Every structure is written in structure tokens, then in C-alpha cells.
Amino acid sequence: MGDSMHVLKLVSDLETPVSTFMKVSRGEEFAFLLESVELGSAFGRHSFIGIGKKDVLVFEKGILRTSNQQLDYTSSPLKAIKDWLEVYRYSVKHDELPSFRGGAVGFVSYDYISYIEKVKVKASVFPTFYFVVPEHLIIFDHLKNNVFIISDSPEELTSKVLSPFEEKPEKNVFVTEPESNFEREQFYKVVEKAKKYIVEGDIFQVVLSQAFTFKTTLDPFYIYRALRMINPSPYMFYLKFGDTVVLGSSPETMAKVEGDKATVKPIAGTRPRGRTVEEDLKLERELLNDEKEIAEHVMLVDLGRNDLGRVCKEGTVRVEKKMVIERYSHVMHIVSQVSGELKDDKDAVDVFEATFPAGTVSGAPKVRAMEIIEELEPTPRGPYAGAVGYFSFPDDKGRMNMDSAITIRSFFFKGKQGWLQAGAGIVYDSVPEREYQETLNKLRALFRSLEVAQKIQGGLF
């Protein structure tokens, strides 16, 4: 365990997380920004910036490693995160800080399921998981207009944080036309194949997705800036780990652990926002009376209860919120919340693995749905439909807090190559043309953010 870290408090009324990130991350190989918008209107109270790395925990091509050594694993590889974090754990004594004061931030790709269940999944060019303990952590408190720098040497960052920000426009940037991994007719055919599996009783539902690839000279952070304006969401993230970048604006929790409480929040059922209050309420009533949407939502709530039942004490799993409407900037969703009290021998990693991947990006029953996804989708999912989030340092009882979002409404980069992807839930009466269009509808904000990012980076926005 490390020593106590220094905390420096500054007034932040002239700074934003975006401008601060651009100042302090310049030239850094490792950096992240985590932000939140609550229910489409107000920014969440805290934003987090991580700079540099104390160490990394990477699982790639079956090899688990840190910055300087390869690690053995006997059970699932992610179980190593607790002992690894213990090495870098530090104490921070400050009453004004939120519960997350340090730990590991990163992403887990969809193909990690191969190490949890007996499902073979295509590996991608991205690591199966990648976590970083940052050298410096900057926390914004938007309510009190304060910023806290947690570091061995916070004075080093202070001058960068308080320095004027100079943005240099770059007009000669390009983005190639995104190319799909499906022809339209080919997608229709795989929807029909999925429906056949449903009729034969293999599954109730499966989520089939369409991926697009493109090349660009855009700085991915400008895409993040555009996306956070166009599609603000409860989970907004930008992770730069070397030449790997994962960024997004996700509406959906994958799983969360705070103390002994584990929570999942299934989202299923969507309508656009109305142009007037009356139209908005009419769309809400229409959504809550849509039998197909309700049936799909109830199935995913049951799946969440079953997942938590594997790691929570008997009789403690309950539905805390049932089918409430949550409104975001462009859409409204039906949302439920399921929680339970952790068994004494289970921790945050157990919760993560019990709920991964979310039923909303796989289907039900989950394992058979993922086998069918593997058969019908032509390319690996990579980080898409995985998770982004953090594990906090273990406390004195060895408990880690964890918060993770499903990696949807997101971009993934390896150098100048970019990917984006979206899925549609296929059920017995799905219409292939509508499901194809749903994948495009979900990507609309992402395509738009590519256009806006070019204007921002070119100084035209």
C-alpha cells in the first residue's frame, strides 16, 4: 500500500473539464476524462481527469501483464485487479472529495465473455481489457466550483491547470466515408436467421449489430467534444491509452457496486423526444402501452435479477424502480433499477462478471444469444457492447467500489483507424427493414459528431 497522497484545492469557476483536459493531457501517452449529464439536463456533480500512469493492467491475446511484468492467472484474468490495485493504494484524507478518490479506469471488450462463459468469441485488434492507475487525478466539483488535484506533486499540474488555453485550428483534416460490415440485404438475411432461432425455441431475443470503419486525421478528442454536445448522457468518457482510444456517451449502466450494494439499470424501450410538452407526454404514453417494448423490458429486468442473484444474498435482490421514463436530450427510455446485497465472499469483480455483457447488447438467454451473435455477425465487436468504468482502490476490508457503463454510442480508435457500431434487438415479429434502420438511427448522433468535430478542429464552430 502506498502512502498518503497530497490534495490541492483550487477554485474552478474559470475552468472546464474539457479545457483543463486539453491543457494537462498535451503530449501525454495516457490520459482520461470522465463526465456525466443527469437525465439530459444538468451536468453531474463531479468530473474526473487522469494524467499519466503509475501502472497498467492489460489482458491481450491471452497474456496478462503490467507495465513491466507478465502475470499468471488461475481463474478469470480480471480477478487480478484487486491485488494489483492493493500495490498502488493510497489514502486521501479530505472531507469534500467524492467516494471515487483513486483506482483503475479502463475498458473491457466484449470478447472477455470467452473467459467467463464457454462461448468462443472472435478477438479484435483491441486488448480484451485495459486498465490504468493514473499518476495524477483531477476532480471537478461543479456544485461548489472547486477542483482537487490528487498527486505526489500537485504543484507540477497547478501551473498547467491555471495557464491560459490556446487552441490552434487545423483545417486540413479528413474523414473517409464510413464503410459497413454488412450489405443491407445481408443484414436482412441474418435477421431472418435470428428469427428462425427464436421460432425454434433457442432464444427469446438476440441483439444483432452493424459496424462501420473509417480513417481520419481528426484528433479523437474533438470527436468527443462534438459528441458531448450532440448526445449528452449519464456516462461520458474519453480514454487515451497509447494508440488506443475509446470515447463515448453512453446512457446505460452496466453494473455498479457501492459498499455492499450491487445495482444494474436495464434500459429497453425508446421513443424520440417530442417537440412540445404535449407531444412528449403522448410519446411517453405510447411507449408505456407498446406491448412489444414492455415484454422486452420485463425480460431484461428478469435477466438482471437472475444475474444479481448469482452474487447477492438470498432474498435481497429487488426491483427498486420499475419501468420509469427517463428523458435525455434526444430520446426517452423505459428504465428499471435492480439491486441486491452482496454475499460475504463476493466482490465488485464478481458482480461485473455475473452481469457482463449486459442483456441489452446480447439477448436472452444470454449464452445462447451470444453463440448466435458469433455465428451471424461477420466481424469482432471489440470494445463495442463491453464496458467502460472504474474499480476503486480496496478499502481496509478489501472491498472495491465499481461503476461501469455499457460501451454503446461510442467510437474506438487504433491510430487513425476508427470504428463505431450499433445493434437492434431481434424478436419473433421483428421486421428486418425496421431493425436495419434502428441501427442507423442509433448511429445518427455519432455520424453527426464526425461532421461537427471537423468544424471544431478547423476553428469553424
Swiss-Prot record:
Its cofactor is Mg(2+). One of its GO terms (molecular function) is metal ion binding. InterPro entries: ADC_synthase, Anth_synth_I-like, Anth_synth_I_N, Chorismate_C. Pathway: Amino-acid biosynthesis; L-tryptophan biosynthesis; L-tryptophan from chorismate: step 1/5. It comes from Thermotoga maritima (strain ATCC 43589 / DSM 3109 / JCM 10099 / NBRC 100826 / MSB8). Binds 1 Mg(2+) ion per subunit. The keyword Transmembrane does not apply. Belongs to the anthranilate synthase component I family. GO terms for biological process: L-tryptophan biosynthetic process. L-tryptophan binds at residues 36, 234-236. This is Anthranilate synthase component 1.
